[in-house]
Amino acid sequence: MTGHKPQSTEETPQMANPLDFVTPTEFVELPSKGRYPTGHPLCGQDTIEIRYMTAKDEDVLTNRSLLKKGLAIERLLTNLIKKNSIDASSLYIGDRNAILIYARASAYGNIYKTKVTCPGCTEVSKHGFDLNEHNVYHGDDIEDTGITTNGGITFTTTLPLSTIEAEIRPLIGTDEISMSKKNKNIKNMTSLVTDQMRYFVVSFNGYTDKKTINLVIDNMTAMDSKHLRNTFKVISPDLQIKDNFECPACGHEEEMTVPFGADFFW
């Protein structure tokens, strides 16, 4: 009787697939320097790891359904962020802008050529922006401004005319998405200033209910409104690309800021 030959317990070595590779990543510095509430995945983190853009990401940017809904950039950000625990919509707008700039530069180069409408004569011309020449603001330059910080998450200022104490915060992705959807449904764009305030105001004299906040905003003097908007800029971390634009048609010169939308990548 022939004995049964035992099978080897060693696995047959697998040949490496030459097409197996990991999408490269890079670390992007956060303008906010991780000034997020306790418990947020980026709280105290100076950087965020993102993936390089792929052909699938390009599909997202050309998806008509997503573009129509204004969700193309949101889907792209979600795909780029490596850690699934980080919700792109919870990031400060300045941090989101930083991710978009680095992703675009690594995918298509640092020179971004786009159409610019001259503020002087409305002539449309091409202008190139260098994405490496960006301005980073951490949103923490509040010394001698009369602004007080509440743990770096919200900030308080006193309106000069009404003396109302206003508590405000930087905007996040959720706010940006909501404002974008609302603006698409509004033909009259004259309320953009007050609409933005409704998002970044946390309270007036300690009152946090929307009814009180809307009442104060709708009746706010121009002086108080300007002060509140300027304070909002001071406390908001951001990364912007600005360049001096000279119109080839009329010679008008002005500093222009690059807008961030789906067409930023084309």
What residue ranges belong to the model's regions?
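Long C-terminal interaction/binding lobes of large macromolecular proteins
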Residues: M1-W266
